[in-house]
């Protein structure tokens, strides 16, 4: 695998906003975008809404290059004052117009009739929607004569390129992760070892206790970490096992913290591995190899590189150290997940860094999170977030790697 750098390009680097426009120009359908969801569950809706948060489903769409939305009286004033949309339309008025456009109805017009009425008024023949668009609404809009195209890939592919402001928001998410790790380290330092047990404040230390402490600390700093992984021993060998029950001394504990910043909606995503007690040589070698693989992966990241090449560097590092991946009817051991994924308004978004070819773009933000998992020995994963640059990766996360706590 080549590790040589691409030759320097003499042209002036484009700002992130310009790169976003170039990516957007390659959207799979020329039709304007349409969304009907809320900003709490939809990263696309939050992106399109330029950060203003509305927690009930609402109509948002493009018309003549403008971002438009329909809001009830409850939200109209707040959304209007935010200036996040180019045009804010009152829902009540458009319900009345839909009544007239579809006379004889026994029930008030729903989203489909309102959207169809809007489309006629705005002289729009149809819309482009995401694969997550409500199926019933999709069918109804087509029945009403609108062309509805499902986007091939992301609805807003330009989301992949992060501006400096977005990168700072993701860095804040990772700062919250670091807050959580500091809490974990403090608890593990204060915990006492009694045989194989870990005792904290006169109680057995459990995964749930760690998870609760992490959530509380992050909430106090302005974030939410609803799902936290704090899994020890063989539980940690299932990468998405959250962890439950007592944690044991001298066993590896994977802590994966992916908080959302409540103010902005952007996510962080970091993982560290810990052990309270004394590690065996096999455990130390496992952790050292994962750390080496992560360094190799990060060193390979730069604009224009195939993400599969980053993944291969991780695989090569593990193979050179003698760690095998095996699959069976009972599950897998070794390294059996991707090296990374995009992070932004969703904790998992484009691009994916795995065996599939994909050219990394300047400004993309990805995780690099290799791991090794062997029941009986334990699991280790180390994860950081980087922004893809023309000459390499820029870390957007920071926390020490001190993992063995006596």
Task: Set out the residue ranges of the language-model regions.
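Active-site neighborhoods and metal-handling regions in enzymes and metal-associated proteins
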Residues: 2-406
